[in-house]
From Swiss-Prot:
Disulfide bonds: none annotated. Hydrolase that can remove conjugated ubiquitin from proteins and participates in endoplasmic reticulum-associated degradation (ERAD) for misfolded lumenal proteins. May act by triming the ubiquitin chain on the associated substrate to facilitate their threading through the VCP/p97 pore. Ubiquitin moieties on substrates may present a steric impediment to the threading process when the substrate is transferred to the VCP pore and threaded through VCP's axial channel. Mediates deubiquitination of 'Lys-27'-, 'Lys-29'- and 'Lys-33'-linked polyubiquitin chains. Interacts with VCP; the interaction is direct. Interacts with FAF2/UBXD8. Interacts with DERL1; however interaction is dependent on the UBAX-like region, suggesting that it may be indirect. Interacts with PLAA, UBXN6 and VCP; may form a complex involved in macroautophagy. Residues 149-155 are annotated as: Cys-loop. This is Ubiquitin thioesterase OTU1. It is found in: Cytoplasm. Residues 144-269 form the OTU domain. The active site is at D152, C155, H262, H337. It comes from the Eukaryota. Residues 45-123 are annotated as: UBX-like. Residues 208-218 are annotated as: Variable-loop. Substrate binds at I261. Transmembrane segments: none annotated.
Length: 343
């Protein structure tokens, strides 16, 4: 997870939302908590056949299985087929104990890891998607999946909280996140003018605090700045990724998927059940963007999206016919149903 400011990650408490969000100033950069050596983030480089990559979000407490999962996602070499060499002359790491921590291996922050495929082990059969990313059998490589959050008008806020907190589903934090956004907007009326907001600054602040309003691009851009991370939203209708905070130099990125009226968080799941899902990625991890596009393309081909400008659709849960954005919004609000298909 991200290193937190006072009161929790980036000022958001892990549960309950007892007000810690509003204590952090808008745009305040949250640094690593504490500063103990055990929590210091490592920066490792990984050199493989496809080039050199930076591995981030690791520490001396990270387990070997997590390191191998990142390497697999970047290189396409399954953990069981990896050979990792370090030092000069390069020597192979002992990968037999996947629960060992990096601090107990002969590597340190700043090292270059040379990754090769072990030719003595059975190879997974690779296939290349139309986006060009290598994919192996699903049992050996981590995959990107969506996690459903409640359709309660606050799916954007719940989804953002989920990914920045490393997989914590807590819809109760939505009101506090709404108040946070209102506080940030109210603090800078010149930046957040009527021309930007579509309503006066004061009207917007009252509007966003309501629990029946939906968040969108403005709110995502504010949260990107507050959490100091790139927020990538992949659209299932256009199979396009909108990257908020892309040019801000953030080192982390999180991902959401959007179908026209509903947001869900994305996470990377690993084959090993003991390895927790990953929701926070390095901003250098372009493999995860390719995986997100593939997920969106699959949803588009199944017509799991909502054209908000012109559509006739049917609720896939109750089969009710709907026309237009307003009817879809009302139906989702009244029933909690968000799985729509175009007719």
């Amino acid at each position: 997870m991200f290193g937190g400011a006072k009161g929790g990650h980036f000022g958001v408490p892990p549960a309950g939302c007892s007000g810690a969000v509003s204590q952090a100033a808008a745009g305040t950069k949250a640094g690593p908590a504490g500063g103990r050596p055990a929590d210091t983030m490592w920066r490792l480089r990984c050199k493989a056949k496809g080039g050199t990559h930076v591995l981030q979000g690791l520490s001396n407490r990270t387990r070997l299985r997590e390191l191998q999962g990142q390497i697999a996602a970047i290189t396409g070499i399954a953990p069981g087929s990896q050979r990792i060499l370090v030092g000069y002359p390069p020597e192979c790491l002992d990968l037999s104990d996947r629960d060992i921590t990096l601090g107990d291996l002969p590597i340190q922050s700043g090292d270059m890891l040379i990754v090769e495929e072990d030719q003595t082990r059975p190879k997974a059969s690779p296939a290349f998607s139309k986006h060009g990313a290598p994919s192996y059998v699903r049992e050996t490589l981590p995959v990107l999946t969506r996690t459903a959050v409640p359709a309660d008008n606050s799916c954007l806020f719940t989804s953002v909280y989920y990914v920045v907190e490393g997989g914590v589903l807590n819809p109760a934090c939505a009101p506090e996140m709404r108040r946070l956004i209102a506080q940030i907007v109210a603090s800078d009326p010149d930046l957040y003018s009527e021309a930007i907001l579509g309503k006066t600054n004061e009207e917007y602040c009252d509007w966003i605090r309501r629990d029946d309003t939906w968040g969108g691009a403005i709110e995502i851009s504010i949260l990107s700045k507050f959490y100091q991370c790139e927020i990538c939203v992949v659209d299932t209708q256009t199979v396009r990724i909108d990257r908020f905070g892309e040019d801000a130099g953030y080192t982390k990125r999180v991902l959401l998927i959007y179908d026209g009226i509903h947001y869900d968080p994305l996470q990377r799941n690993f084959p090993d059940p003991d390895t927790p899902p990953l929701t926070i990625f390095s901003s250098n991890d372009d493999i995860v963007l390719v995986q997100a596009l593939e997920l969106a393309d699959e949803a588009r081909r199944k017509r799991q999206f909502t054209d908000v400008n012109r559509f006739t659709l049917r609720c896939m849960l109750c089969q009710k016919g709907l026309t237009g954005q307003a009817e879809a919004r009302d139906h989702a609000r009244e029933t909690g149903h968000t799985n729509f298909g175009e007719v």
